[in-house]
Amino acid sequence: TDCFKRNDPMRPVTNALCNASPDADVEGMDANLLKNADQIYFARVTEAFAAPLDVTGYNYMPERFEMDHAYFPNKVFCATETAPADSCHGWSLVERFPFLIGDFVWTAMDYIGEAGIGRTLVDEPLEGLAEYPYRLAGTGDLDLCGRKRPRSYYRDCVWGIAKRPYLAVEPPCLYGKKQNTTMWGWPVVEEYWNYPGMEGKPVKVSVYSMAAETALYLNGKLIGVQPSGKPNHFIASFQLPYQPGELTAVNLEDGKEICRHTIRTPGLPAHIRL
């Protein structure tokens, strides 16, 4: 910390305490120590490490912020790593606690390495890192080209900055199957409505929405209205038989339309342009 301060005295210094995974294979180490230790013991084993820091970072330990603030009332905390699926709960803690200044997810953009830590398998168990041909981590709100993934649109709702509802469609070929997702992953969904040969087959649609209620329409026909917004973790869930055409989500407040978004089945290709 002293070295950093000599070179840059203006900005705060942070470092992270990391909760090891339950199956961590580290000799002589209780993998759940940092997460499950009682408050006084945790304070004793971490106090010297955290003392020089301006901001104490915790990785994957949201349950410790409130209890450790009681023991260290003058500390400033930050969630230095969190899992994508925990974004709603994690951000609610930032909004609730003034001593918790932010939440960082692992990770903003996908990357090469730690192959498959964010993968999802269908009707198969997940075990460790993925083998070749996996190369990407498979996590990240943005893909390697910088394009937003569904989880990024969900986070927009959590942050209160979403401009419209997002239609997260589970491909109908996955209906009734179990998606096994790592803690860094996200279910297989896409804002897409083109499944030839699946007409009449059931499909699940999750709408990411900040509104109190969300209505779903297929080809102008109301499928249903479901609660959404923060009390429902910003997700309105629907099931319907697939039919090509237009799928529309409408955000509602007090029964009045706020905004809408539509996805459409494309027509036949007309030509190729180079």
Feature-to-residue mapping (PLM):
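Substrate-binding clefts and catalytic carboxylate motifs of secreted carbohydrate-active enzymes
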Residues: D2-N7, R11-A31, D38, E47-L274
